[in-house]
A protein has these predicted regions:
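Hydrophobic helix-coil surface modules that form long, contiguous segments used
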Residues: 2-140, 169
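Zinc-dependent metallopeptidase catalytic helix centered on the HExxH motif
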Residues: 124-181
Length: 181
């Protein structure tokens, strides 16, 4: 748990070209130099900046308005596409209900996270070892945090209910509005 103000981030990272980078920021520049690739990213008004590197990622993407939504997983299957479609749908619901999403990209990354997920500015983790329906719910909950806890910040130590409660309630509102609750 933490409390953080917003800041502007600029990051450049060089990695072996076989690696894929998933991170909070928007890609600004990519330079391939032999066996290495250098990526540059920016993030305006972020509460934090997170990234995940892997040489095993399969990447799926959709567009929602001005935002590119990415889903990174170790394998692409029918559940991946269902989860991504549902993320896009809830993303649009949250945007119309709670206000415009502030970043150019949003990435959901399956990781070896212990359980559930974790939100960061423009990116969230979901545990890859969950059943598909649990993974989906975690992704929806962490997507809601892009509005509650990220865009609208709070003291996550002394007022944790604010973002957790609003994120959870937002998922229920979305599921109810789409007839899935």
């Amino acid at each position: 748990p933490y409390y953080s103000d917003v800041a502007d981030y600029s990051l450049s990272i060089g990695v072996p070209s076989r690696f894929t980078v998933a991170c909070s920021g928007s890609p600004e520049k990519t330079v391939i130099d032999g066996e290495r690739t250098k990526y540059s990213y920016t993030l305006k008004n972020g509460r934090d900046f997170a990234m995940v590197l892997s040489d095993k990622f399969c990447v799926s993407a959709v567009k929602s308005g001005k935002t590119d939504i990415f889903y990174y997983s170790a394998e692409k299957d029918e559940n991946t596409e269902k989860i991504l479609a549902e993320i896009k749908s809830c993303f649009e619901y949250f945007g119309s209900s709670f206000g415009e999403y502030p970043y150019k990209t949003f990435s959901v990354v399956e990781t070896e996270f212990i359980l559930g997920g974790m939100e960061y500015s423009g990116l969230c983790y979901v545990a890859e070892n969950q059943a598909p329906e649990e993974k989906l719910y975690a992704a929806l909950h962490e997507t809601a945090h892009q509005w509650w806890g990220i865009t609208v910040g709070n003291d996550q130590i002394n007022e944790a209910f604010l973002d957790e409660g609003l994120a959870e309630f937002s998922v229920y509102l979305y599921l109810d509005s789409s007839g899935k609750n």
